[in-house]
Amino acid sequence: MPDRRTELMDAALRVVADKGMKGLTHRAVDAAAQLAEGTTSNYYRTRAALVEAALGRMEQLDGQLLQDLAPSGPPGTVAELADQLAGLVLSLTGKHAALTRARLALSLDQPDAVKAGHFRLVGGMENTLAALGVTDAAARARDVADYGDGVMLHLLTVRRDGQPDAAAIAAAVRRLLAP
């Protein structure tokens, strides 16, 4: 059973995913968490504190997803990495689509607040690429992150009725990382 703060932040992310940032209020989080009115404001006195905590929870969930997709550790080859990233994209646009919608809304509303998490992700990708011997790892890490973000945006918007193709996503990542 999650603790109360985790429960509230999961509810806050659901609210943002469903209603956008304008819908994120203490009362909306209380309702989404099915808790008494005023509960959220007891834990997070201001909207800024609520947003900051939601961003922290989002980053925590992202870390859990990455760990779940690569339980045996970092990939040993570019092909393994491409497959893992394709799996992540499918997860973030399928089972965890609400988390991605919340991420997009938070990113548009609070770009400076999500910047640090983005750079940690890209930095981790850069380290992984360098360990795999990929040349120009920094630029390629940015390219892969940009590609993944674009694919997720399209799968949640203009291509939401289509079936995502893990093999095609992995092939595109391999092309981005080819010598």
Model-predicted regions and their roles:
Residues 51-58, 114:
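Alpha-helical DNA-contacting segments of helix-turn-helix folds
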Residues 63-64, 83, 95-102, 109-135, ...:
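Amphipathic alpha-helical packing segments from all-alpha helical-bundle domains
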Residues 7, 11, 15-53:
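Helix-turn-helix
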Residues 89, 102-107, 144, 148-151:
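Short alpha-helical scaffolding segments that buttress acidic/His motifs in well-ordered protein cores
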Residues 115, 119, 130-179:
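Hydrophobic/aromatic-rich alpha-helical bundle segments in the mid-to-C-terminal region
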Residues 66-99, 144:
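Hydrophobic alpha-helical connector segments
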Residues 1-6, 178-179:
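Actinobacteria-biased recognition of intrinsically disordered, low-complexity terminal regions
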